[in-house]
């Protein structure tokens, strides 16, 4: 894409927000409490701070302040304020391609705020438990939060992901012409690695004229043992395995499509 010569600072705001979901089946009330305690510890404020700090290095941000809090009975929040150092726009890659994976992170840019909130949830009947994390990476200027997408999804090992990317505001070039987006994008999927795309069913709902891009992701492979807590499939009879599989599948479909579906 042709590089714009800007008048002053790039005033565009780019926001990447997504929900990730982890689904689990627990057979007893004690198992349910155990899963909630386990997932709450796995994604406590300290670990989330580590993940978000690494995210800062991916988008090239300088950390100004970190606010973090664990909650009772469960949940955690982390917010990081970040700033951008002066950079040469010619050094910024705005092309559509996946960002780095966790083992290949290199700091190369800088910028705004990054936050995450977690929501463990369960119901006393049915045995289903869900863990949801809401994440937002918002930057101003030339830096793209999309570069953090690959890393965050890999780190959080999600069953279901809903992603929203939007560009707000405008910037002017040296001739005074407004530009409401400064990079090419057809789909958020173009910023994901091929191995990630192979793992998920994906669906796009994009509003191009408004610079709004929405992608939903649902894990393709279903292996019951990955969704059971404190019990293995071998300990269940065939009827129980089918009932639990149907229950989990229905739950995941409802979350993926964002609506209540009839039980078949």
Swiss-Prot record:
Protein name from the UniProt record: S-adenosylmethionine decarboxylase proenzyme
Quaternary structure, from the entry: Heterooctamer of four alpha and four beta chains arranged as a tetramer of alpha/beta heterodimers.
Catalysed transformations (reactions): S-adenosyl-L-methionine + H(+) = S-adenosyl 3-(methylsulfanyl)propylamine + CO2
Pathway: Amine and polyamine biosynthesis; S-adenosylmethioninamine biosynthesis; S-adenosylmethioninamine from S-adenosyl-L-methionine: step 1/1
An MF annotation (GO) of this entry: adenosylmethionine decarboxylase activity
Biological-process GO terms, alphabetical: spermidine biosynthetic process
Family affiliation: Belongs to the prokaryotic AdoMetDC family. Type 2 subfamily.
Entry-linked InterPro entries: AdoMetDC_fam_prok, S-AdoMet_deCO2ase_bac, S-AdoMet_deCO2ase_core
Keyword S-adenosyl-L-methionine: yes
Function field: Catalyzes the decarboxylation of S-adenosylmethionine to S-adenosylmethioninamine (dcAdoMet), the propylamine donor required for the synthesis of the polyamines spermine and spermidine from the diamine putrescine.
PANTHER family recorded: S-ADENOSYLMETHIONINE DECARBOXYLASE PROENZYME
GO cellular component, as recorded: cytosol
Cofactor binding summary note: Binds 1 pyruvoyl group covalently per subunit.
Residues of the site described as Cleavage (non-hydrolytic): 111-112
Catalytic residues in the record: 112 (schiff-base intermediate with substrate), 117 (proton acceptor), 140 (proton donor)
Changes after translation: Is synthesized initially as an inactive proenzyme. Formation of the active enzyme involves a self-maturation process in which the active site pyruvoyl group is generated from an internal serine residue via an autocatalytic post-translational modification. Two non-identical subunits are generated from the proenzyme in this reaction, and the pyruvate is formed at the N-terminus of the alpha chain, which is derived from the carboxyl end of the proenzyme.
Cofactor requirement: pyruvate
SUPFAM superfamilies: S-adenosylmethionine decarboxylase
Pfam families for the chain: AdoMet_dc (PF02675)
Modified residues annotated as Pyruvic acid (Ser) in this record: 112
The enzyme's E.C. designation: 4.1.1.50
Keywords assigned by UniProt, alphabetized: Autocatalytic cleavage, Decarboxylase, Lyase, Polyamine biosynthesis, Pyruvate, S-adenosyl-L-methionine, Schiff base, Spermidine biosynthesis, Zymogen
């Amino acid at each position: 894409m042709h590089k714009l010569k800007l008048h002053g600072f790039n005033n565009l705001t780019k926001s990447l927000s997504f929900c990730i979901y982890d689904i689990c089946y627990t057979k007893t009330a004690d198992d349910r409490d155990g899963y909630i305690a386990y997932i709450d510890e796995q994604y406590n404020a300290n670990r989330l701070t580590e993940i978000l700090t690494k995210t800062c290095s991916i988008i090239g941000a300088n950390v100004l302040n970190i606010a973090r809090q664990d909650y009772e009975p469960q949940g955690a929040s982390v917010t990081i304020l970040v700033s951008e150092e002066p950079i040469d726009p010619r050094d910024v890659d705005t092309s559509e391609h996946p960002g780095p994976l966790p083992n290949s992170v290199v700091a190369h840019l800088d910028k705004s705020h990054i936050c995450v909130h977690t929501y463990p949830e369960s119901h006393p009947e049915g045995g289903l438990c869900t863990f949801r994390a809401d994440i937002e990476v918002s930057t101003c200027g030339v830096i793209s939060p999309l570069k953090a997408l690959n890393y965050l999804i890999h780190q959080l090992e999600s069953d279901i992901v809903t992603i929203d990317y939007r560009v707000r505001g405008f910037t002017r070039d040296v001739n005074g012409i407004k530009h409401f987006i400064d990079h090419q994008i057809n789909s958020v999927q173009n910023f994901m690695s091929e191995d990630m795309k192979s793992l998920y069913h994906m669906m796009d709902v994009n509003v191009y004229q408004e610079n709004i891009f929405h992608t939903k992701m649902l894990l393709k492979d279903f292996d019951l043992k990955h969704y059971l807590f404190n019990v293995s499939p071998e300990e269940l009879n065939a009827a129980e395995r089918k009932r639990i599989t149907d229950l989990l599948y229905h739950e995941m479909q409802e979350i993926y499509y964002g609506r209540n579906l009839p039980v078949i």
